[in-house]
Amino acid sequence: MRIGQARYRFEFRLLAGESADDFGTVAALRPLIAPWTADVADSELTLLRVTEYTFRAQIADRWRRGNIFILGDAAHLTPPFIGQGMGAGVRDAMNLAWKIAGVRNGTLAADVLDSYEQERKPHTRSMIWLALNVGRSMTGGGRIGNLVRRLVLPRVRLLPGLRDMVVDSTTPALRSSALVSKSRRPRQLAGTLCPNPPLPGGQRLDDAVGAGFAFITTSPPGDADEALLRRRGVAVLVANGDTELKKWLREGRCAAAIVRPDRTVMRAGRDSTALCAWTATVLRPAAAPQSPAP
């Protein structure tokens, strides 16, 4: 793997009886890296680091006890084959932080904190499963496996489903929870990530909305609906014209969507007034701070 202009990272499986200490010099590494460095003299190679990793795939049984939550590597360990280990920890933090803030400022009920594990655990399990299978496809099978990899991997990008999961790093949708309301339709926006396209004013959606909720609609809401949303700190964005947001709503077969601070779609539908009314049952106007239930 190329890192920057002049650094490369190589990974090799250690055989029985071998350790990283056996490969502490360029000379010792030569047989392994020769296919990529045959024309490079030893004097032009600088060995920066040799280290040994043990890859694990683990998920904690419980992610919450009272007001104590675990996240990141404390909650799950992901093999590195799809580069999603750190990303999973960031998703944990993004999923949990705004919920705690909402409970503290009174806009969310304390029991929504249970949705952290309900949403993140199945998602993490899916990503670990994918990483394990990608790892097996990259390293298993001996000589036959090597032959299959040479034939198949260059063509992965031609298969839409695999390309989205492996090459484009498309993340699975979250399951239903107190803060993800899905319909029975097989393809829908609820639980998926909202895009971050440029808006007509030049800003991107994330910059315009900040760390709050967003109500994205193809037509402006009525005065009463807009006032209801504003009282709950929800930004209103109208996706009109030939914009990426309007195309996104159209592909999701809906006219409006309510998007969470972590940019997950909470709910979407064709009736924006009904969606506003539903939002009012989940989000409350700011009130006195409260503590999560023990």
Region annotations inferred by a language model:
Residues 35, 103-294:
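Helical substrate-recognition/capping region of FAD-dependent monooxygenase/halogenase enzymes
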Residues 64-80:
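Short FAD-binding loop at a beta-strand-to-alpha-helix junction that anchors the flavin cofactor
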Residues 81-83, 87, 94, 113, ...:
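Catalytic cores of eukaryotic secretory-pathway lumenal/extracellular enzymes that build
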Residues 76-87, 137-140:
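Glycine-rich phosphate/pyrophosphate-binding beta-alpha loops
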Residues 50-56, 195-200:
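Short gly/ser/thr-rich secondary-structure transition/capping motifs
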Residues 68-73, 88-95:
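Hydrophobic alpha-helical bundles that form the membrane domains of multi-pass transporters
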Residues 1-50:
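Conserved FAD/dinucleotide-binding core of flavoprotein oxidoreductases
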